[in-house]
Amino acid sequence: MTSPSQVLPASAGKPTGPNADPKEIDKFSELAHHWWDPNSEFKPLHDLNPLRLGWIDGIAGLAGKKVVDIGCGGGILSESMARLGANVRGIDLSTKALRVADLHSLESGVAVNYEEIAAEALAAREPGSVDVVTCMEMLEHVPDPESIVQACATLVRPGGHVFVSTINRNLKAYLMAVVGAEYILQMLPRGTHDYEKFITPSEMARFARNAGLDLVEMRGMTYNPLSQIYSLSRDTDVNYMMAFRRVAE
């Protein structure tokens, strides 16, 4: 079993403020036209989507819920949640990715509202307005991930859920997510990940506590290259997901 460290992030955000990296935006905007090609650089994301969707739905129950998907990219997770009956808004700061997301929504007939806005700006504008916030494969690509977590906590109503996923920071994660996925297996373009931006579970838990979020569940993810199937795991050494609930007032 190997880790799904080859998964491309949804988006890193657009350089409209201090919590964005222009290089990250340029890097992933260049891949925007490949979002919905299951055999492109985004194949791992397509393969992973059923697992993370089922995990999120199992905890939060998406049907009828108002959801914001931060760093939605081309809308793979956003559309999947909408298909389960959620009222989804996908936000991103990559103009190209959002154009792809809008077009695919029209083609598929799955209604998703997309908006080009920073998480912090939306949180300031609409605090406590949604039931669920997702921020998947994105936090390791911004300068200040704690600011994004705080925005997630501000956006969600008391008692609502916040879901995040990212990559742990240790030798195993470096070998698998950077050396293995980018240089040996060449599953991702070189330079996709910056090891220094990886986030340990303890750091993520601290961000959440500071934002008034309680941990509900943490799970790792593993990948079987033969079956091309992702599975939940207790191993959080590389890729992991965390579910939080905003403390009720």
Swiss-Prot record:
<comment type="pathway">
    <text>Cofactor biosynthesis; ubiquinone biosynthesis.</text>
</comment>
<feature type="binding site">
    <location>
        <position position="71"/>
    </location>
    <ligand>
        <name>S-adenosyl-L-methionine</name>
    </ligand>
</feature>
<dbReference type="Pfam" id="PF13489">
    <property type="entry name" value="Methyltransf_23"/>
</dbReference>
<feature type="region of interest" description="Disordered">
    <location>
        <begin position="1"/>
        <end position="23"/>
    </location>
</feature>
<dbReference type="GO" id="GO:0032259">
    <property type="term" value="P:methylation"/>
</dbReference>
<dbReference type="InterPro" id="IPR029063">
    <property type="entry name" value="SAM-dependent_MTases_sf"/>
</dbReference>
<keyword id="KW-0831">Ubiquinone biosynthesis</keyword>
<feature type="binding site">
    <location>
        <position position="52"/>
    </location>
    <ligand>
        <name>S-adenosyl-L-methionine</name>
    </ligand>
</feature>
<keyword id="KW-0949">S-adenosyl-L-methionine</keyword>
<protein>
    <recommendedName>
        <fullName>Ubiquinone biosynthesis O-methyltransferase</fullName>
        <ecNumber>2.1.1.222</ecNumber>
        <ecNumber>2.1.1.64</ecNumber>
    </recommendedName>
</protein>
<dbReference type="GO" id="GO:0010420">
    <property type="term" value="F:polyprenyldihydroxybenzoate methyltransferase activity"/>
</dbReference>
<keyword id="KW-0489">Methyltransferase</keyword>
<dbReference type="GO" id="GO:0061542">
    <property type="term" value="F:3-demethylubiquinol 3-O-methyltransferase activity"/>
</dbReference>
<comment type="similarity">
    <text>Belongs to the methyltransferase superfamily. UbiG/COQ3 family.</text>
</comment>
<feature type="binding site">
    <location>
        <position position="136"/>
    </location>
    <ligand>
        <name>S-adenosyl-L-methionine</name>
    </ligand>
</feature>
<comment type="function">
    <text>O-methyltransferase that catalyzes the 2 O-methylation steps in the ubiquinone biosynthetic pathway.</text>
</comment>
<feature type="binding site">
    <location>
        <position position="92"/>
    </location>
    <ligand>
        <name>S-adenosyl-L-methionine</name>
    </ligand>
</feature>
<dbReference type="GO" id="GO:0102208">
    <property type="term" value="F:2-polyprenyl-6-hydroxyphenol methylase activity"/>
</dbReference>
<dbReference type="InterPro" id="IPR010233">
    <property type="entry name" value="UbiG_MeTrfase"/>
</dbReference>
<keyword id="KW-0808">Transferase</keyword>
